[in-house]
């Protein structure tokens, strides 16, 4: 049986491996580090003495690729969220609190209810989102949503920046339309916010590795790809050159490179790919005890300060700041002080931060999702017949999210299966 070689065991690579293994194909997965998951993983932090996620990820029940992936690997019950959609917000400038509550049906009755929408907004304000349907690749988020409008700072900007990890006045609006269409556009049933109950590895990584291992797929850690060798006619790859040796490819073998854009650019010389990236800063605080149930909202959007979103899991409070280029340049102590100041107000806690805190900076979290970057997103198929590409930065039509990463892996697998490679 032909072998499919998948290089990169992040979410995209795992998605490809799971899809191909599910279809009964023989796969080998290579990962340069000693763990799978890439930017989507959990680890034990010695400072906090707790398992924490490398980054916080908010998912929606309408993320179909995520849900299908979790179902295949047996982790469909590993996410948690409200029974009905509810998005809590806190405004640091006015100290107002509110909760956006979409109704379950497709028609958005909720925008006609003052108690279910953003304070100061009217039902007609939400119709701005329809303009996303006609957004061109050059259209910015701020071209669609008026920055001076009542919804921008309190709803559209937090949503856009968290999804695109790019400032709203630089971000490509076109990427938001499929996100809204597949979630909020289908009604509240598909827009329930979900987070990993225990951690990202427990939901997305460990069950996938178990599934692959039980199915006979091979996984090699510490395998760093240096280069690839092409056949004499240049139409196919003939070998993968790893630091510890070469892997010769059989005539019917295929390869999926599920690597970050900068890494892939070093291996496939001359291939265009997005070069500009934006960081994400996550800060984790360990409390002396879990919050009281009244205050223990799983997550909350924060506007008017440094923090974008905060997440609560047992005695750990985690915050995320997207497109955090300026914040990422600050010292650990400055970041802790700035983010805790927001948390203390949002959750009504003391002004002094807990002694146990951990700052995690992901300096190249995603590519800058700007109009200039969109044409540089790679297609699944390449000039080499037996080479496919995957990764959240490839041209999925979606932003660089977990949903996009899983779809990219599935697309690479589908390309192989449909060609009977």
Spans of features found by a protein language model:
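Glycine-rich active-site loop/strand segments that organize a redox cofactor
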Residues: 38-62, 128-130
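Conserved Rossmann-like nucleotide-cofactor binding loop
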Residues: 12, 35, 262
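Mid-domain catalytic core of redox enzymes
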Residues: 223-350, 377-381
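N-terminal Rossmann-like FAD-binding beta1-loop-alpha1 element of flavoenzymes
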Residues: 2-29
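Glycine-rich FAD pyrophosphate-binding loop
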Residues: 21-46
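Helical element adjacent to the flavin cofactor pocket in flavoenzyme catalytic cores
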Residues: 179-244
């Amino acid at each position: 049986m032909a072998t499919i070689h998948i290089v990169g065991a992040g979410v995209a690579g795992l998605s490809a491996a799971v899809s191909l293994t599910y279809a009964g194909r023989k796969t080998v997965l290579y990962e340069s580090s000693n763990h799978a998951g890439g930017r989507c993983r959990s680890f034990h932090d010695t400072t906090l003495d707790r398992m924490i996620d490398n980054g916080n990820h908010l998912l929606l029940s309408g993320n179909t690729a995520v849900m299908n992936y979790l179902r295949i690997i047996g982790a469909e019950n590993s996410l948690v969220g409200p029974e009905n959609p509810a998005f809590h917000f806190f405004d640091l400038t006015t100290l107002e609190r509110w909760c956006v509550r979409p109704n379950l049906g497709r028609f958005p009755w909720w925008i006609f209810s003052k108690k279910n929408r953003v304070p100061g907004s009217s039902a007609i304000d939400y119709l701005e989102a329809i303009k996303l349907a006609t957004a061109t690749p050059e259209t910015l988020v701020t071209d669609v949503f008026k920055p001076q409008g009542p919804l921008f700072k309190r709803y559209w900007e937090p949503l856009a920046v968290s999804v695109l990890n790019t400032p709203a006045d630089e971000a490509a609006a076109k990427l938001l339309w499929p996100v809204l269409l597949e979630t909020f556009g289908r009604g509240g049933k598909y827009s329930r916010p979900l987070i990993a109950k225990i951690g990202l590895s427990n939901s997305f990584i460990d069950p996938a590795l178990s599934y692959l291992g039980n199915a006979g797929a091979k996984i090699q850690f510490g395998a760093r790809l240096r280069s690839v060798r092409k056949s004499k006619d240049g139409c196919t790859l003939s070998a993968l050159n790893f630091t510890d040796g070469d892997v010769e490819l059989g005539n019917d073998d295929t390869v999926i490179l599920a690597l970050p854009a900068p890494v892939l650019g070093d291996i496939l010389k001359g291939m265009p790919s997005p070069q500009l990236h934006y960081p994400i800063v996550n800060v984790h605080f360990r409390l002396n005890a879990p919050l009281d149930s009244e205050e223990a909202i799983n997550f909350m959007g924060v506007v008017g300060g440094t923090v974008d979103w905060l997440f609560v899991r047992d005695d750990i409070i985690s915050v995320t700041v997207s497109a955090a280029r300026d914040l990422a340049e600050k010292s650990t102590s400055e970041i802790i002080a700035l983010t805790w100041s927001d948390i203390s107000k949002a959750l009504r806690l003391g002004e002094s931060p807990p002694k146990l805190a951990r700052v995690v900076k992901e300096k190249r979290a995603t590519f800058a999702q700007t109009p200039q970057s969109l044409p540089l997103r790679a297609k699944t198929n390449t000039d080499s017949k037996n080479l496919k590409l995957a990764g959240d930065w490839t041209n999925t039509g979606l932003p660089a999210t977990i949903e996009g990463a899983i779809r990219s892996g599935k697309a690479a697998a589908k390309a192989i299966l449909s060609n009977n490679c």
